[in-house]
Amino acid sequence: MLKAVILIGGPQKGTRFRPLSFEVPKPLFPVAGVPMIQHHIEACAQVPGMQEILLIGFYQPDEPLTQFLEAAQQEFNLPVRYLQEFAPLGTGGGLYHFRDQILAGSPEAFFVLNADVCSDFPLSAMLEAHRRQRHPFLLLGTTANRTQSLNYGCIVENPQTHEVLHYVEKPSTFISDIINCGIYLFSPEALKPLRDVFQRNQQDGQLEDSPGLWPGAGTIRLEQDVFSALAGQGQIYVHLTDGIWSQIKSAGSALYASRLYLSRYQDTHPERLAKHTPGGPWIRGNVYIHPTAKVAPSAVLGPNVSIGKGVTVGEGVRLRESIVLHGATLQEHTCVLHSIVGWGSTVGRWARVEGTPSDPNPNDPRARMDSESLFKDGKLLPAITILGCRVRIPAEVLILNSIVLPHKELSRSFTNQIIL
């Protein structure tokens, strides 16, 4: 028996994802046509012996999240439950707080996946590796170049046994080109070190004149409090993958993740990819079109385009490297490149909405997405263009490298701007 836990965070996280996270929780943002964490759930559901999937986070269980859980249970015929933390507890605190729920039924092991990663999720391969050695912690690792490795948790392994000898979260100097993917497989014994951290936090925070539990004791950081502390003690091992992997920290990285997932659909979900048919729009490369979307026959879509529910795409529209969300309208002859068009937004005829791609260096096979700040030296860095919810763009204007917050009605062109 196996279980899976998906760590979805809370509203205080994902600030780099704004304005898109204003409308839906970041884990429910559509990537390649389906909510971000549906890719995780699909991968978990395919593992033989999977009995339950738990989501742990600090979001309020609102209507979108509740509807998603109900739909996921129906589609995958598995219990999918949300466990809400009483406070943000870090990457390990929720696991310890809900340990009884996780261990109910005595699972052999349980997967732990961060919601904000894009991957092909080699969970079956991880399970095979775990069953060969049965150590408490198994981490999925991949490689990054020397410079970008400093932005991740870095792993020094024994190349023969794959034991993690040293772990440093976001080191200041180069440690290793092997990085933590945020995807783990834990045995039930893995919760014992979390208990030790909780008890140590309790002792450190306990005041002599304040009996009772210290409220901060439940905050546990897997990476710093557990992995770094236990590295080199024969408890943590790494399983390396050369498959697709990327973090989804910003809107630009969501667009890149959409491309990766759309390319995987050729093997995993070919039915989700649009095909060129007589009388239909021109399709170039990998494109997802929701069945309820209305797309004019003269529109040209792709590559890497995702069109959501109820979208209207007019005659002569050109769409490339973009996500168009639920209910948006692209009027005749608009051009949308490297952009995300928000829910219910309208782009007027002959308007152009364009961003600058922020993809990894194509000449470096180990390059990863950079999650840089929006600004450098007081100037907005060129990046993809984002239109928030219900933005109205007039006809014949250019919106370039800009972020438009929700419910704005523009009257002219903008370049390199954040429109508040």
UniProtKB/Swiss-Prot annotation:
Effect listed in the UniProt record for changing G182D: In AAMR; drastically reduced protein expression
Gene Ontology terms: cellular component: cytoplasm; cytosol; extracellular exosome; GDP-mannose pyrophosphorylase complex
Region (Hexapeptide repeat domain): 273-420
GO biological process per UniProt: cognition; GDP-mannose biosynthetic process; GDP-mannose metabolic process; motor behavior; muscle organ morphogenesis; negative regulation of biosynthetic process; negative regulation of nucleobase-containing compound metabolic process; negative regulation of phosphate metabolic process
Pfam families according to UniProt: GMPPB_C, NTP_transferase
Known disease link: Alacrima, achalasia, and impaired intellectual development syndrome: An autosomal recessive disorder characterized by onset of alacrima, achalasia, and intellectual disability at birth or in early infancy. More variable features include hypotonia, gait abnormalities, anisocoria, and visual or hearing deficits. The disorder shows similarity to the triple A syndrome, but patients with AAMR do not have adrenal insufficiency.
PANTHER family to which the protein is assigned, alphabetical: SUGAR-1-PHOSPHATE GUANYL TRANSFERASE
Protein name: Mannose-1-phosphate guanylyltransferase regulatory subunit alpha
Phylogenetic placement of the source organism: Eukaryota, Metazoa, Chordata, Craniata, Vertebrata
Protein's gene: GMPPA
